[in-house]
Amino acid sequence: MTDILIDNTATEAVRALIQAFSLVPVSQPPEQGSYLLAEHDTVSLRLVGEKSSVIVDFASGAAQYRRTKGGGELIAKAVNHTAHPTVWDATAGLGRDSFVLASLGLAVTAFEQHPAVACLLSDGIRRALLNPETQDTAARITLHFGNAAVQMPALVQTQGKPDIVYLDPMYPERRKSAAVKKEMTYFHRLVGEAQDEAALLHTARQTAKKRVVVKRPRLGEHLAGQAPAYQYTGKSTRFDVYLPYGTDKG
């Protein structure tokens, strides 16, 4: 469970949103560790003893730059966005890649199992829907709170298989800016790093119709030690493409 401190300035929209997640309301910050803070119209992640915070904001910062100046060309090639219109992001996290995929015109279903992270992402999507510059992109993202490995097979039964399953398992950040390093420190302390990568990749390959795309560091190891069918490599990032079971091209 994650503590959430609800300030008296928190709007009704924020108060209603946080009720959807398994969060523990508290009257003061914990003595150590991380917690969520709901104040005004935003939910943020805080670390005790630190002044900075983490929020999901698709209208400014890196998200705004990628939206207005371009970006995402490599990921667009990896998912073959013109031919494959539906993507399930099984490791949504703070939603950056989900937003990039949605900005390419794809219908994105995002899964996040950690309640605090899902709350942060849901809050970011909510505010993006209210902004004329981001609302069209945000409207293409549907967030599911829960374990993707469990939820995807069930969702296939009602919606059918997506064209693409996208995975971005956490890995150590290297050669990043101080701001990104601090954000990832907050994130790793909150959710930890344990992931059953083999099981996740297995479920993804069972779920996708066309391909599974895995984001990795350019020189990083293959996910679960399994070699992909092919790769798209950039300066710092690599996208490994795996084919669904029983297919020979994607």
UniProtKB/Swiss-Prot annotation:
Its EC number is 2.1.1.242. InterPro entries: 16SrRNA_methylTrfase_J (IPR007536), SAM-dependent_MTases_sf (IPR029063). It is an enzyme of class 2 (transferase). GO terms for molecular function: rRNA (guanine-N2-)-methyltransferase activity. Pfam families: SAM_MT (PF04445). It catalyses: guanosine(1516) in 16S rRNA + S-adenosyl-L-methionine = N(2)-methylguanosine(1516) in 16S rRNA + S-adenosyl-L-homocysteine + H(+). Disulfide bonds: none annotated. It comes from the Bacteria. GO terms for cellular component: cytoplasm. S-adenosyl-L-methionine binds at R96, D97, D168. It is found in: Cytoplasm. Its main location: cytoplasm. Keywords: Cytoplasm, Methyltransferase, rRNA processing, S-adenosyl-L-methionine, Transferase. Belongs to the methyltransferase superfamily. RsmJ family. Specifically methylates the guanosine in position 1516 of 16S rRNA. This is Ribosomal RNA small subunit methyltransferase J.
